[in-house]
Amino acid sequence: MLSLNYGFTISIILFFIGIISLLIHKNLIFILVSLEVLINSIILGFILIGKYWKQIDCCVLYIFIVTIATVEVSVMLAIFLRIYQRYHTLDIYKLREISK
């Protein structure tokens, strides 16, 4: 079992990987995956805090956040599909040029 320090280290590393990936990528799908990595790193932190304080509330919060994230991903993928069908690209810079 992981100790609290290792768990928070993994959570912080995942958070920064998500931030860096969010800043580097210009494809909407990769940006969505980066946001999911960020959300999951925050969820991991909540679970570790709940385990440390021996509270079940964080597990309930985990289920709620995962449900919201799943709905978010499905809606965003549907929007991305429509964008791709219309403009034939998911590159944010090309979409910005098209919209001008």
Swiss-Prot record:
Pfam family, one: Oxidored_q2
UniProt keyword annotations, A-Z: Cell membrane, Membrane, NAD, Quinone, Translocase, Transmembrane, Transmembrane helix, Transport, Ubiquinone
Keyword tRNA processing attached: no
Transmembrane residue ranges: 4-24, 29-49, 60-80
One GO molecular-function entry: quinone binding
Source taxon at top rank: Bacteria
InterPro entries: NADH_UbQ_OxRdtase_chain4L/K, NUOK/Mnh_C1-like
GO annotations of cellular component type: NADH dehydrogenase complex; plasma membrane
Family designation: Belongs to the complex I subunit 4L family.
Subunit text: NDH-1 is composed of 13 different subunits. Subunits NuoA, H, J, K, L, M, N constitute the membrane sector of the complex.
Full protein name: NADH-quinone oxidoreductase subunit K
